[in-house]
């Protein structure tokens, strides 16, 4: 018999039902569960797949560069970044006739095009690219890297080049390589690019391979470096009247501490960013030399962790046993990596708009909104994944004997206290926040808005004041105009910072009031509830009072038969499943808040947000309903406009989202009967019956139906909001 899918599991391949396909897809990446897997093959498969992932990333970024060079308008955008709309790529086949062709022909293009809201134009411009040829060169280089990555992945699966398990578990060498080799060297290389190419480019000097050895990045060359007069590199920075991309008002400094933003581009000073990357490079190059490898000097991770026993005895045996637990569990390591990556992705979202790094991106409002929302959603999925793999670690890899009385075991021992505290925090936040919103709703409904309960966020305002915001009148730390810190800030360090904080047209320390106070606590409710579900799922993954033997059932079990009440819906997978709904809900509130606050800031009517955000009807009517009007008018009796594609996506997103409920709520047997009926009709229809249906249809398992429902819910939710966000922002700001 020919090999059937899935090849990695003979048991599944012989299953005569549709389970074969579903379970095959579900376990394709669960290498640990495959036939004939060994620890060595497991590590080698994961290692090789990393190269495949890199190849895909390089191919994708190469495609971005290639399509903009081929079909975009980069060169004309560079001439006037604030008024030319950047083109992502052409639309080959615009449906709906001539009106569609006209609606989508913009940005100076000859035919229908898509506008870029990803910020790549601003990024490429900032780092010194200027022509289509530059973009093609970059695309080819990344294509080359993609091919190299594929070859490397294939190579490391060949017997001669397969690394051993001991190589994968050599924590110190990996730390040194990642810290120095990846972070340190790449940050240093990026500093080099900024100093040699980007900064001269911002001053009208076009540096390429043919002249980069002749153009001095700084008039004094390397002299100040070798004589220790490093401050010379900071002297004569670009002036406030500097026109980006020209020599007008340009200085000669390459590494500065100006603070604040370039007045024309509204982005951070390139010379500040070069300085930042140089400092990062230095720190990581040092950090990558701290761990003991071939030379018998430096730290051993195991010794470090074994020594971490707090003397008070309140953490028991501290970190004893953690080294082997972490180093031998891929799921623990993946959980740590996902948690870190999730947090950093959310930080990227917060910093991209408040401290924009790319020239003119702060004035491209739709791009700002799209990038913020994109990074927050990505962060949410990555963070929930961290807890999922934490739970799998507890089920598959945790060894109680190895971790006796250390911090990990103690966390499991007092999980009731952790879970109940999180529960209490969630209940407190939920009831109080909803109570305030609903009270305010009722007051407005009864025509007595002055009876709202409006709470000023005085602690947050105090923190903003401490960082230099003067409008609240707190007169503390950096906002105290006669204090030593304030005076030093004016002259020695970051003189531009205080100007930027108090300039009301950017997004640094937005002025906050009662509406912000309420939505902050609504978001806190979402964060705490999501965390509660995820933490409970992981801490109860091995067992609970109700089901002490839970770990024997694996990560995703539906129930333990009809004879054991209460064992349904309590697997670690169910916790992940529930948490994703809360995560999406929370990020919905976060992005609504960000978007509405910024729309009113950009339009110059901040009072609309301040007055309407203190009650729920305000959010529903003045944010969602009011801003969806343009979107819904993408098609109307008079024809169509360039928002029509978002109108269609908005409807389609709702459709996908609603489809999710059919799987989340319907009986699963309904689907089995439906599929059987379709199969019956299929086999009795000429031509169609040439393709035989081999697998007997069986109902989706409970877990599968939930997964399909969750996938539709998530995808539909994000599609719907993406269309709303882009249409409502681009419809207002051209």
UniProtKB/Swiss-Prot annotation:
Domain of life from the UniProt record: Eukaryota
Keyword Lipid biosynthesis included in the entry's annotation: no
GO cellular component terms listed in the entry, alphabetical order: chloroplast thylakoid membrane; photosystem I
A GO BP annotation: photosynthesis
Cofactor comment: P700 is a chlorophyll a/chlorophyll a' dimer, A0 is one or more chlorophyll a, A1 is one or both phylloquinones and FX is a shared 4Fe-4S iron-sulfur center.
InterPro entries: PSI_PsaA/B, PSI_PsaA/B_CS, PSI_PsaA/B_sf, PSI_PsaB
GO MF term list: 4 iron, 4 sulfur cluster binding; chlorophyll binding; electron transfer activity; magnesium ion binding; oxidoreductase activity
Enzyme nomenclature, EC number: 1.97.1.12
Entry function: PsaA and PsaB bind P700, the primary electron donor of photosystem I (PSI), as well as the electron acceptors A0, A1 and FX. PSI is a plastocyanin-ferredoxin oxidoreductase, converting photonic excitation into a charge separation, which transfers an electron from the donor P700 chlorophyll pair to the spectroscopically characterized acceptors A0, A1, FX, FA and FB in turn. Oxidized P700 is reduced on the lumenal side of the thylakoid membrane by plastocyanin.
Identification of the protein by name: Photosystem I P700 chlorophyll a apoprotein A2
Encoding gene per record: psaB
């Amino acid at each position: 018999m020919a090999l059937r899918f899935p090849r990695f599991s003979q048991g599944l391949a012989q299953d005569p039902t549709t389970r074969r396909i579903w379970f095959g897809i579900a376990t394709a990446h669960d290498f640990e569960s495959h036939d004939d897997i060994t620890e060595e093959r497991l590590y080698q498969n994961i290692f090789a797949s990393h190269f495949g992932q890199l190849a895909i990333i390089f191919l994708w970024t190469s495609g971005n560069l290639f399509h903009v060079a081929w079909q975009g308008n980069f060169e004309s955008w560079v001439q006037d970044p604030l008024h030319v709309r950047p083109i992502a790529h052409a639309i080959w086949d615009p449906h709906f006739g001539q009106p569609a062709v006209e609606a989508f022909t913009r940005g100076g293009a000859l035919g229908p095009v898509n506008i870029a809201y990803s910020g790549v134009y601003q990024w490429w411009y900032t780092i010194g690219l200027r022509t289509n040829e530059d973009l093609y060169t970059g695309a080819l280089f990344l294509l080359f890297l993609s091919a190299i990555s594929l070859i490397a992945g294939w190579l490391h699966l060949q017997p001669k080049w397969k690394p051993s398990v001991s190589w994968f578990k050599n924590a110190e060498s990996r730390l040194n390589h990642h810290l120095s080799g990846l972070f340190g060297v790449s940050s240093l290389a990026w500093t080099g690019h900024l100093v040699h190419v980007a900064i001269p480019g911002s001053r009208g000097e076009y540096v390429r391979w043919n002249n980069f050895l002749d153009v001095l990045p700084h008039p004094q060359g390397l002299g100040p470096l070798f004589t220790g007069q490093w401050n010379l590199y900071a002297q004569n920075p670009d002036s406030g009247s500097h026109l980006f991309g020209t020599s007008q008002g340009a200085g000669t400094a390459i590494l500065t501490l100006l603070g604040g933003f370039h007045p024309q581009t509204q982005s951070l000073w390139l010379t500040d960013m070069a300085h930042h990357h140089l400092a990062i490079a230095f720190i990581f190059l040092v950090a990558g030399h701290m761990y003991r490898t071939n030379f018998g000097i430096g730290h051993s991770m195991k010794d470090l962790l074994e020594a971490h026993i707090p003397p008070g005895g309140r953490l028991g045996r501290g970190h004893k046993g953690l080294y082997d637990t972490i180093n031998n569990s891929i799921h623990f390591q993946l959980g740590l990596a996902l948690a870190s990556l999730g947090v950093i992705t959310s930080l990227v979202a917060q910093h991209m708009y408040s401290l924009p790094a790319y020239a003119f991106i702060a004035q491209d409002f739709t791009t700002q909104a799209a990038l913020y929302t994109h990074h927050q959603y990505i962060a949410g999925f990555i963070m929930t994944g961290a807890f999922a793999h934490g739970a799998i670690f507890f089920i598959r890899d945790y060894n109680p004997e190895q971790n006796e009385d250390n911090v990990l075991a103690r966390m499991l021992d007092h999980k009731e206290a952790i879970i109940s505290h999180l529960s209490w925090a969630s209940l407190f936040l939920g009831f109080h926040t909803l109570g305030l919103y609903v009270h305010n709703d009722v007051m407005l409904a009864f025509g007595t808005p002055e009876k709202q309960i409006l709470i000023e966020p005085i602690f947050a305002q105090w923190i903003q004041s401490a960082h230099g915001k003067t409008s609240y009148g707190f007169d503390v730390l950096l906002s105290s105009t006669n204090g030593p810190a304030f005076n030093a800030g004016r002259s020695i360090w970051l003189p531009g910072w205080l100007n930027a904080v108090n300039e009301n047209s950017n997004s640094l320390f937005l002025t906050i009031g009662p509406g912000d106070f309420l939505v902050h606590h609504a978001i806190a409710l979402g964060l705490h509830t999501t965390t509660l579900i995820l933490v409970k799922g992981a801490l109860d993954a091995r067992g609970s009072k109700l089901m002490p033997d839970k770990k024997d059932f694996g990560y995703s079990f539906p129930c333990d038969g009809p004879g054991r009440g209460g064992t349904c819906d309590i697997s670690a997978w169910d916790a992940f499943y529930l948490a994703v709904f809360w995560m999406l809900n929370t990020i919905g509130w976060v992005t609504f808040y960000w978007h509405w606050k910024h729309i009113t800031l950009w339009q110059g009517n901040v009072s609309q947000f301040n007055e309407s955000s203190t009650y729920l009807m305000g959010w529903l009517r003045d944010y969602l309903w009011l801003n969806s009007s343009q979107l819904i008018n993408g098609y109307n009796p008079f024809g169509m406009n360039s928002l029509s594609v978002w109108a269609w996506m908005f409807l389609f997103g709702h459709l996908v989202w609603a489809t999710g409920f059919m799987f989340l709520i319907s009986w699963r047997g309904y689907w089995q009967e439906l599929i059987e009926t379709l199969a019956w009709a299929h086999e009795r229809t000429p031509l169609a019956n040439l393709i035989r249906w081999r697998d007997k249809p069986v109902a989706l398992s409970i877990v599968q139906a939930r997964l399909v429902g969750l996938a539709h819910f998530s995808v539909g939710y994000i599609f719907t909001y993406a269309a709303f966000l882009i249409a409502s922002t681009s419809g207002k700001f051209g």
